[in-house]
UniProtKB/Swiss-Prot annotation:
The gene is ndhF. It catalyses: a plastoquinone + NADH + (n+1) H(+)(in) = a plastoquinol + NAD(+) + n H(+)(out); a plastoquinone + NADPH + (n+1) H(+)(in) = a plastoquinol + NADP(+) + n H(+)(out). The chain crosses the membrane at residues 9-29, 39-59, 89-109, 125-145, 147-167, 185-205, 224-244, 258-278, 280-300, 327-347, 354-374, 396-416, 425-445, 542-562, 605-625, 714-734. It comes from Oryza sativa subsp. indica (Rice). NDH shuttles electrons from NAD(P)H:plastoquinone, via FMN and iron-sulfur (Fe-S) centers, to quinones in the photosynthetic chain and possibly in a chloroplast respiratory chain. The immediate electron acceptor for the enzyme in this species is believed to be plastoquinone. Couples the redox reaction to proton translocation, and thus conserves the redox energy in a proton gradient. InterPro entries: NADH_UbQ_OxRdtase_chlpt_su5_C, NADHpl_OxRdtase_5_subgr, ND/Mrp_TM, NU5C-like, Proton_antipo_N. One of its GO terms (molecular function) is NADH dehydrogenase (ubiquinone) activity. The keyword Cell division does not apply. This is NAD(P)H-quinone oxidoreductase subunit 5, chloroplastic. Coiled coil: none annotated.
Length: 734
């Protein structure tokens, strides 16, 4: 056992050989390396699989009750200062190791087929393998300075992958947005680390937790300074985990390839912020003000993310706001001290969200032959619908992932979300109300995504191409170059100016028999157009979906309570028992059957109500409800109907425009900073340069005058002599 722990440092380094091999291959024999590029996927998956085996072995030992293991190397800079670095294996580390390696392996397998036709295939695998290495290094770090080092590497890899198709201006802009937004949080994190080093003289977790347990309660250190430094640490997690108000980068990060979206949202970048708060939770617990602030930010984020997802048309962007909302649940759980519930939801959400993102990648892959490679079309749910007939395996996987995120038992997210809701009600009714209401919203917008994508009919064949922009005749290839679309313009929709209602009246107004006429039609000129239909992706892309489906079905069992001779336990609570975090889970985590059933009924009822409302407005039964004039039967009379319409319009506008937060940031910060730079430029050019140029010009003019006076003319000498005498006499006589 001890022998296994001694070699745990190998886990983060295992993916590095294939990264270096690809780099040397591209440098020394680029042609051969590119021709054999598909071969590099196998060693990438193999090495990460070895890391997964190590991680599983360590996790089994942690579950069986092993103690915490920490190994440190010391680098002595001088007699007064030494830098320690090493690795730490505890329950939190083992959980994150399994999460990163399992999801990472499945994403690599999926990417081999998804990115097979991309010119940047090797570059993608280098980035994603280094991404996994950086995240593995982050979770095994034993002190804050190591965490910050790998924190920056994780951010760097995410920026490279978000802007992977850098020839597309919108992808380059999304990369810059993610970089600038995270710079705010990373700068705060660095200041917080330096602040605690100044307070304690150490960056080790043991020393920080010792101070949190002993010094802070006894007022032996400046509490105000400690709160400020803790807030700065939390600021880093706010940016990395897309919490309000630094969440604006996450939806734009969808400009990267879909596999990396799955990895970022499931097990790497956004999970890093949750991991940081979980790792430092003993420090934050000693500061009640910071804990209250964490729970407040989490509550705002979970509600905001849910409302912004209500009216999005892009399937990946909708899932991105869903991730933002679920991260808010985790942050809320950590803020109220529900450590186990937060980690439980981190696990269940990771597998469910990876399933949904990879499923959306299969949907996009199937739509590209119809609409081209432009993300504005291939990811637009307005053009989808009826895909259950063409990609049934993807549809089944996506449906189970959707139901899991909605909180339907016995799927994974039901168990973790129900635990968070129960603890929220016990901590504060305010948090409980918002968290429960958002659970209903989650069911609504997630089932909306499913219905718009898979239910009804394939709408792309029944839309008129109405764009007048020249760019609409072009599509974006897999590697970002503009190419002419080989798609019939009679059934391609440009949605740049078309309005889609919050409740999709415009999506189902089609005769019931039109579905039988799909196939071909003749235009007025007599030309016959044959439609292209979506198709299921290859087995390489379907295999990760099926594995993630199994995880979504059964991973929730680790949090199900079982009775033993001592009391109620779960596999997860047994796993987390020997924790370095020096605190115990609150007693309310162990609940009786009646309380569990009561909480479950209320949360499932909210989820089912959200599903019903979504099906009522977006399902195939919408035409039936519309014929019954069901809405108008509830909203009779002019004023009430007008109020309902205006409310619906306001909600749609709020959601579709991202809560106007991006607009506010653009006008306040972007335009404000631009105006300040223009003012600075004017001051620099007009005042500073004016003074400098004025001095030079004045010197030149004076020199010319002196030169003219000293030219040997007697009249000039007499004139200046009389002037000097006059001035002298004036001052002398006065």
């Amino acid at each position: 056992m001890e022998h296994t722990y001694q070699y745990a440092w190998v886990i983060p380094l295992l993916p590095l050989p294939v990264i270096m091999s690809m780099g040397f291959g591209l440098f020394l024999v680029p042609t051969a390396t590119k021709n054999l590029r598909r071969i590099w996927a196998f060693p990438s998956v193999l090495l990460l699989s070895i890391a997964m085996v190590f991680s599983v072995h360590l996790s089994i030992q942690q579950i069986n009750g092993s103690s915490i293991y920490q190994y440190l190397w010391s680098w002595t800079v001088n007699n007064d200062f030494s830098l320690e670095f090493g690795y730490l294996i505890d329950p939190l580390t083992s959980i994150m190791l399994i999460l990163i390696t399992t999801v990472g392996i499945l994403v690599l397998i999926y990417s081999d087929d998804y990115m097979s036709h991309d010119e940047g295939y090797l570059r993608f695998f280098v980035y994603i393998s280094f991404f996994n290495t950086s995240m593995l290094g982050l979770v095994t770090s034993s002190n804050l300075i190591q965490i910050y080092f790998f924190w920056e590497l994780v951010g760097m890899c995410s920026y490279l992958l978000i802007g992977f198709w850098f020839t597309r201006p919108i992808a380059a802009s999304a990369c810059q947005k993610a970089f600038v937004t995270n710079r705010v949080g990373d700068f705060g994190l660095l200041l917080g680390i330096l602040g605690f080093f100044w307070i304690t003289g150490s960056l080790e977790f043991r020393d920080l937790f010792k101070i949190a347990n002993n010094w802070i309660p006894n007022n032996e250190i400046n509490s105000l300074l400690t709160i400020l430094c803790a807030f700065l640490l939390f600021l880093g997690a706010v940016a990395k985990s897309a919490q309000f108000p630094l969440h604006v980068w996450l939806p734009d990060a969808m400009e990267g390839p879909t596999p990396i979206s799955a990895l970022i949202h499931a097990a790497t970048m956004v999970a890093a912020g949750i991991f940081l708060i979980a790792r430092l939770l003993p420090l934050f617990i000693s500061l009640p003000l910071i804990m209250s602030f964490i729970s407040l930010i989490g509550t705002l984020t979970l509600f905001l993310g849910a409302t912004l997802a209500l009216a999005q048309r892009d399937i990946k962007r909708s899932l991105a706001y869903s991730t933002m909302s679920q991260l808010g649940y985790m942050m809320l759980a950590l803020g109220i001290g529900s450590y186990q519930a937060a980690l439980f939801h981190l696990i269940t959400h990771a597998y469910s969200k990876a399933l949904l993102f990879l499923g959306s990648g299969s949907v996009i892959h199937s739509m590209e032959p119809l609409v081209g490679y432009s993300p504005d079309k291939s990811q637009n749910m307005v053009l989808m619908g009826g895909l259950r007939k063409y990609i049934p395996i993807t549809r089944t996987c996506f449906l189970w992932g959707t139901l899991s995120l909605c909180g339907i038992p016995p799927l994974a997210c039901f168990w973790s979300k129900d635990e968070i809701l129960s603890n929220s009600w016990l901590y504060s009714p305010f948090f409980g109300i918002i968290a429960s209401f958002t659970a209903g919203l989650t069911a609504f917008y997630m089932f909306r995504i499913y219905l718009l994508t898979f239910d009804g009919y394939l709408r792309v064949h029944f839309q008129n191409y109405s764009s007048t922009k020249e760019d609409s005749l072009y599509s974006i290839s897999l590697w970002g170059k503009r190419i002419s679309k080989g798609v019939n313009r009679d059934f391609v929709l440009s949605t740049a100016k078309s309005g889609v209602s919050f409740f999709s009246q415009n999506l189902s107004k089609i005769h019931v028999n039109t579905g039988n006429r799909i196939g071909s039609f003749s235009t007025s000129l007599g030309t016959k157009n044959t439609f292209v239909y979506p198709h299921e992706p290859g087995n390489t892309m379907l295999f990760p979906l099926l594995i993630l489906l199994l995880c979504t079905l059964f991973i929730g069992s680790i949090g199900i309570h079982f009775d033993n001779e001592i009391g109620e336990l779960t596999i997860l609570s047994k796993w987390l028992t020997p924790s370095i975090n020096f605190f115990q889970e609150s007693s309310n985590s162990s609940i009786n059957s009646y309380e569990f059933i009561t909480n479950a009924i209320s949360s499932v009822s909210l989820a089912i109500f959200g599903l019903f409302i979504a099906y009522m407005f977006y399902g195939s039964a919408y035409s039936f409800f519309q014929n019954l004039d069901l809405i108008n039967s509830f909203v009779k009379g002019g004023p009430k109907k007008y109020f309902f319409h205006q409310l619906k319009k306001k909600i749609y506008s709020w959601s579709y425009n991202r809560g106007y937060i991006d607009i506010f940031y653009t006008r306040t910060f972007t335009l404000g900073i631009r105006g300040l730079t223009e003012l600075t430029q004017f001051f620099d050019k007009g005042v500073i340069d004016g003074i400098t140029n004025g001095v030079g010009l004045a010197s030149f003019c004076i020199g010319e005058e002196i030169k003219y006076v000293g030219g040997g003319r007697i009249s000039s000498y007499l004139f200046f002599f009389l002037c000097y005498v006059s001035v002298f006499l004036f001052f002398f006589l006065s």
